[in-house]
UniProtKB/Swiss-Prot annotation:
One of its GO terms (molecular function) is proton transmembrane transporter activity. The modification N6-acetyllysine is found at K54, K57. It is a single-pass membrane protein. This is ATP synthase F(0) complex subunit 8. The keyword ATP-binding does not apply. Belongs to the ATPase protein 8 family. The chain crosses the membrane at residues 8-24.
Length: 68
C-alpha cells in the first residue's frame, strides 16, 4: 500500500487561508456602513387598556347588602 504524500499539504492549506482572507477583505471593503450611527429610541405608543378607559368598581363581600 503506497504512502500518502503530505508534502504539499502545508502549501495548499496556507494558500487556502490566504485566499479566504483576501476574499473576505474584499467583501468587507465593499460593504457600506452608516457614516454616523446613532442609537435611536423606539417610539413607544401607549395602548389604552380596557380598565383604564372605563370606571370599574370592585365589590367586596362586606360592602354587599345583607341578604336574608
Amino acid at each position: 500500500m503506497p504512502q500518502l504524500d503530505t508534502s504539499t499539504w502545508f502549501t495548499t492549506i496556507l494558500s487556502m487561508f490566504l485566499t479566504l482572507f483576501i476574499i473576505f477583505q474584499l467583501k468587507i471593503s465593499k460593504h457600506t456602513y452608516h457614516p454616523n450611527p446613532e442609537t435611536t429610541l423606539p417610539m413607544t405608543q401607549k395602548q389604552p387598556t380596557p380598565w383604564e378607559t372605563k370606571w370599574t368598581k370592585i365589590y367586596s363581600p362586606l360592602s354587599l347588602p345583607l341578604q336574608s
